[in-house]
Amino acid sequence: AGRVGFPVLVRPSYVLGGQNMRIVINDDELERQVLSIFKHLPDNRVLIDQFLERTKEAEIDAIYDGEDLHIMGIMEHIEPAGIHSGDSSAVLPTYSLSEQAIQTMCDHAHKIAQALNIRGLINIQFAIKEDQVYVIEANPRASRTTPFIAKAYQAPYLNIASRIMLGVNKLRDFDIVKKLDGYAIKIPVFSFEKFPGVDKRLGPEMKSTGEAIHFIKDLKDPYFRELDRNRSMYLYN
């Protein structure tokens, strides 16, 4: 933390749903968070990452066959980086990222899939600040956005990825056609009314219990305009 400077993101080295992840802003909070992690997860290790404030987040889902990479979709989050991806509304395809940032993300995705020797699905999350692209994490598996993208594009991605994982086919064996007229918005579903006393502020720990899909024809749609108008790049605003 002294090397990268506060705020920092403190988390267990392996975690699902952002459990026990916290953004801390000083030494006292850092000490409390580290002790809390070791108390609840004594066999884990602690990672301390620089936290980029007021930063956009986007993610790529892709299929890699050892030679070629197919970008299934790129989703841009409405909420800033620091909000768990499962709690953020997200738009497919992206709507405000520059072509330079998108190309950089795709280049990084190919290099990461190649370096990890992936066969099948991979999800990579990025933070984008002033067109500078940072890799948050790479998950060499199906993510919660995989079925969302398959549904939105009406493409049999799970079947394709399964056959590539088994070594039956290569990407070149498939004629993949994406069918989406407009945009698809991922909408998190919360059940706060069933959990009284839960902190409703969004952060790196996931709190949603599901998600829905909303299709729009263009960015003039009232639903999207309302989401975008209320967009804040600050946490806990």
PLM features: residue spans?
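ATP-dependent carboxylate activation and anion-phosphoryl transfer catalytic cores
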Residues: 4-7, 17-18, 24-237
